[in-house]
Amino acid sequence: MVRVKRGVTKHRRHKKILELAKGYQLGRSKLYRHANEAVLKALRYQYRDRRARKRDFRRLWIIRINAAARQHGMPYRDFIHGLKQAGVEVDRKMLADLAVHDPSAFGQLVEVARRAL
């Protein structure tokens, strides 16, 4: 059997990890073992937080819609239910945007929801 030398492979692997660890402090950016741990943990956080961001934004949109709907005398749950009854298919992201940037249009949607109930 021919002996396999792993120098180039190891160097490339280490270089890839140390490149990802750029900007970390102390040994976490210079030493392979520490950098590898830090990078793996960072990638786990990144994966988790990509999913959490979706939940956080939905929560924010709901809070904004609720606040705007209550200014028009209607709670969030009745507003959403009324929109569904009226057949209005506007997602929460757009509703929150309307509530912030175009309150008059949002008020018209509240009236549509109120009539549908």
Curated annotation (Swiss-Prot):
Q: Phosphoprotein: present as a keyword of the record?
A: no
Write down the Pfam families for this protein, in alphabetical order. Answer: Ribosomal_L20
Q: Please give the InterPro entries that the UniProt record associates with this protein.
A: Ribosomal_bL20 (IPR005813), RIBOSOMAL_L20_CS (IPR049946), Ribosomal_protein_bL20_C (IPR035566)
Molecular function via GO: rRNA binding; structural constituent of ribosome
The domain of life is Bacteria
Q: Name one GO cellular component term.
A: ribosome
Q: Which UniProt keywords apply?
A: Ribonucleoprotein, Ribosomal protein, RNA-binding, rRNA-binding
Gene3D superfamilies according to UniProt: 6.10.160.10, Ribosomal protein L20
* GO biological processes: ribosomal large subunit assembly; translation
Chain's role: Binds directly to 23S ribosomal RNA and is necessary for the in vitro assembly process of the 50S ribosomal subunit. It is not involved in the protein synthesizing functions of that subunit.
Q: Which PANTHER family match?
A: 39S RIBOSOMAL PROTEIN L20
Family membership, please give it.
Answer: Belongs to the bacterial ribosomal protein bL20 family.
HAMAP family xref list:
Ribosomal_bL20 (MF_00382)
Listed name of the protein: Large ribosomal subunit protein bL20
Q: What is the name of the gene encoding this protein?
A: rplT
